[in-house]
Amino acid sequence: ALQWYRPFTFTCEWGNKSLQSRNIPQWLLDKDLWIRSKGVTDTVMAAINKTIDFFGEGIGVHTYYWHNYPYDTHYPDYFPAKPEFEGMISTIQKRKCHAVPYINGRLWDPAADSYTALNGASASCRKADGTLYTEIYPTSKVLNTVTCPASSLWHEIIIGLADKIQNELHTNGVY
């Protein structure tokens, strides 16, 4: 992949710009330390605060398990977020750190409401025999379809989701 994919990336709009000419916030370029939080609980928030106390401001907090559904299920239906999540984000930001929640940008759970409502199968990758590519992870044991990254439907969903996360939950970005 290194021999063909890396050179290919430099021919694409998203890969041919230098870091200096990309629209990357300075805080992200300056980030020295990222921590991963798993959940929205008092215990998790105490651990985040303890880490900030020790290392100081400027930490990036990469948040997982912030949504109401079990992990690796109901993608991309992340809303509503857990009720405490917005307060967690606010606390992190008041301590001069940045919060960036995780979303899965390639899987769509056929059990998600959006899969039926938006005809998720139409945006899913298919094998040569026409069947869907699917994956099951040990975190959930739920079958998910692999979504075509070139699908205009999927672009709309992911862009809308990223906008909603940043605008309604006031995060510093989305991973």
Language-model features: where?
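Compositionally biased, intrinsically disordered low-complexity regions enriched in proline and serine
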Residues: R6-T9, P70, T116, T134
